[in-house]
Amino acid sequence: MAVLIETTLGDLIIDLFVKERPRCSLNFLKLCKKKYYNLNQFHSIERNYVAQTGDPTGTGKGGESVYSDMYGEQGRYFEREDLPKMRHTRMGIVSFVNNGDNMLGSQFFITLGENLDYLDDQHTIFGQVTEGLETLEKLNEQLADTNNRPFKDIRISHTIVLDDPFDEDARISFPPRSPSPTYEMLVKTDQIALDEKEDEDEGKTAEEIAEELQQREMAEQAQILEMVGDLKDADEVPPENVLFVCKLNPVTTDEDLEIIFSRFGKINNCEIVRDRRSGDSLQYAFIEFDNAKSCEQAFFKMDNVLIDDRRIHVDFSQSVSQNYKYKPKSQQQEAPKRRQSPQRRPEVKRSHQRSPSPRRRRSPSPKKDKKRDYRREPARRRRSSDNHRDRDRSYRDNNRDRRDNHRDSDRDRRRHDRSPDRRRDRR
């Protein structure tokens, strides 16, 4: 009463509790004999808990018992067996999965931990793993996602019944050979294949690994520059025919640098970068050659060369600004002329100035022919300081007039008080 299960991680031998669980043992043995579990996936693995399989769909919602061949649709699930009591006390216990209504189908799990007592009253134990505990250790070490689905594609490759104490039933059909894998199993999978290398650095030297890491860092930096807007495309590369020259003497000019580097080939552009305001040299320059070969020769020959009492440094340019540099009209390609359709009327060149309507045409006015008389032009606008000065002067004049008026009124009042008529009135 034993079954050999061959998995992609190793073999397992399961002994069945035929006397204690006869219906469960019959269901498991006949399903193994009819190759029902072949190519089934371990769709759920929880570390130190359980590894679940037995669902041909790989979703955890499918599967049916062998009694469906005997009794039809009503035998898809069968009632679980409770007695005698058995407990999940160690690694390697095999139990059928309860579908929620105390009914069992084809799905089963193998415990990967010890003392899992909370599984005793829910699921039905029908066997235990006697050989292949190292395979269970491998299952327990597998990494899984948040839904407990392993990243690796682990399957049951074959099942062999070593001992079957039950009689054969004519209603159960057994295939002559093991089923072949489907196209979805081989290609349409998002899991890691077993023959796929997990360690990408296996068989590589330290130099190759360091070079790959450097390339990854460069790609990450390029993507960051693209996101912040410094690069238009992360895969953009600088031109191969441009040299970067630094540590120049401030007195070195563009013409001198072009003459020195022109012996390696034709130079399209030689420019020393200067300060925008002062025009002083920033002591570095860009030299654009006609081809990449000349640029490479200059790189090997001119590095650390003495120019104007300065040891210059030469390197390939890493700037992509040359790709978007404005080209003068002499270097721009003219757009092809539009082809004239034979059915359309020939185009007539028109001036940008709109011709006046015949009704609006008038004879030229004699006033317009007169020369401009600058003597009648209005005076230029006064400055703001002049305006403020005039305003202050007018303010002082107004105050002076006001004081004079008050002084005159006081003088008249005193004269009136001194008059004889005013004195007579007081008496």
From Swiss-Prot:
Its EC number is 5.2.1.8. The keyword Transcription applies. Residues 322-334 have a biased composition (Polar residues). Residues 322-427 are annotated as: Disordered. InterPro entries: CRIP (IPR035542), Cyclophilin-like_dom_sf (IPR029000), Cyclophilin-type_PPIase_dom (IPR002130), Cyclophilin_PPIL4 (IPR035538), Nucleotide-bd_a/b_plait_sf (IPR012677), RBD_domain_sf (IPR035979), RRM_dom (IPR000504). GO terms for molecular function: peptidyl-prolyl cis-trans isomerase activity; RNA binding; RNA polymerase II complex binding. The keyword Membrane does not apply. Ubiquitous. This is Peptidyl-prolyl cis-trans isomerase sig-7. It comes from Caenorhabditis elegans.
